[in-house]
């Protein structure tokens, strides 16, 4: 079905989804800037261990508990593990020399 032939309410719904996606992208960008800054702070303080699996697990568990959507907890875990992993890679790339332990 061509976009122009879609019912108006579906078109409006998709526009709202697109707006939310842009907001999510902006929030991920803001998160990535904070992660990079945290990495700089850690580097400056001499903290060479920047990956903390216990913090990641705690964060994900908290997010799963706060989840009020119909998205299953396992999917929430997957989504946030991906976001954390992408930010971890970015932090590692920007810091350059920290070890993962």
What would you call each of these model-derived segments?
Residues 1-101:
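Domain-level signature for soluble enzymes in the chorismate/prephenate branch of the shikimate pathway
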């Amino acid at each position: 079905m061509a976009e122009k032939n879609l019912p108006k309410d579906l078109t409006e719904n998709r526009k709202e989804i697109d707006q939310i996606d842009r907001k999510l992208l902006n929030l991920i960008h803001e998160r990535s800037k904070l992660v990079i800054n945290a990495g700089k702070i850690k580097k400056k303080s001499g903290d060479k261990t920047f990956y903390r699996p216990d913090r990641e697990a705690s964060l994900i568990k908290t997010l799963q508990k706060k989840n009020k959507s119909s998205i299953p907890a396992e999917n929430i875990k997957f989504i946030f593990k991906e976001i954390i992993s992408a930010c971890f890679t970015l932090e590692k790339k920007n810091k350059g020399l920290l070890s993962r332990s």
